[in-house]
């Protein structure tokens, strides 16, 4: 790995390398997703951990008390290190970049599905099965976004290919033809 990498990439790649060496890619994927969920759903937790007004050891104890046994010790050590170097604010970016490395190693592909309404689990599963057949890949993870501005239908973005079957686009194309 190049020495010109940014700190986020260095930390993320180090986590990925540990996961690979330990043969724990699936576990780290799950752990990284757990950390990301905590960051998004309980922002106060990492605000407390990153608060420089709090004692450093107290912040480390918060991490250990709440995450030990839930995530791998190397990831807890990463958070401890970020506390030491006053860079907890980088954790989300590190986690997302490490997830990119892990997903690539596990051959996991991401698909962005934009709909005007909430999809059921069954609808998502059927859509993923179709995509797996069409693109011949085993592991696809959906990112479902509800965007009422597309009016109806859906838009699928998979590996830089866009299938836009939204009502908004259809109407736009009709207007374009008329003008």
UniProtKB/Swiss-Prot annotation:
GO cellular component terms attached to this protein's record: plasma membrane; proton-transporting ATP synthase complex
GO MF annotation terms: proton-transporting ATP synthase activity, rotational mechanism
Primary subcellular site in the record, as a coarse category: membrane
Keywords: ATP synthesis, Cell membrane, CF(1), Hydrogen ion transport, Ion transport, Membrane, Transport
Family, similarity comment: Belongs to the ATPase delta chain family.
Subunit structure: F-type ATPases have 2 components, F(1) - the catalytic core - and F(0) - the membrane proton channel. F(1) has five subunits: alpha(3), beta(3), gamma(1), delta(1), epsilon(1). F(0) has three main subunits: a(1), b(2) and c(10-14). The alpha and beta chains form an alternating ring which encloses part of the gamma chain. F(1) is attached to F(0) by a central stalk formed by the gamma and epsilon chains, while a peripheral stalk is formed by the delta and b chains.
Record function comment: F(1)F(0) ATP synthase produces ATP from ADP in the presence of a proton or sodium gradient. F-type ATPases consist of two structural domains, F(1) containing the extramembraneous catalytic core and F(0) containing the membrane proton channel, linked together by a central stalk and a peripheral stalk. During catalysis, ATP synthesis in the catalytic domain of F(1) is coupled via a rotary mechanism of the central stalk subunits to proton translocation. This protein is part of the stalk that links CF(0) to CF(1). It either transmits conformational changes from CF(0) to CF(1) or is implicated in proton conduction.
Matches recorded under PANTHER family: ATP SYNTHASE DELTA CHAIN
Protein name as annotated: ATP synthase subunit delta
Gene name as annotated: atpH
């Amino acid at each position: 790995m190049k020495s010109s990498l940014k700190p986020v990439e260095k930390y993320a790649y180090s986590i990925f390398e540990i996961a690979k060496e330990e043969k724990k890619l699936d576990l780290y994927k799950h752990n990284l997703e757990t950390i990301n969920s905590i960051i998004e759903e309980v922002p106060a937790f990492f605000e407390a951990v990153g608060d420089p007004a709090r004692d450093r050891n107290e912040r480390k104890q918060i991490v250990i008390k709440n995450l030990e046994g839930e995530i791998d010790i190397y990831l807890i050590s990463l958070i401890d290190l970020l506390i030491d170097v006053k860079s907890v604010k980088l954790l989300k970016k590190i986690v997302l970049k490490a997830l990119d490395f892990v997903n690539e190693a596990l051959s996991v592909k991401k698909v962005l599905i934009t709909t005007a309404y909430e999809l059921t689990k069954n609808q998502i599963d059927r859509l993923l099965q179709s995509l797996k057949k069409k693109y011949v890949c085993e592991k696809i993870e959906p990112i479902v976004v509800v965007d009422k501005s597309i009016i109806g239908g859906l838009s699928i973005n998979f590996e830089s290919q866009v299938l836009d079957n939204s009502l908004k686009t259809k109407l736009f194309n009709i207007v374009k033809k008329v003008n």
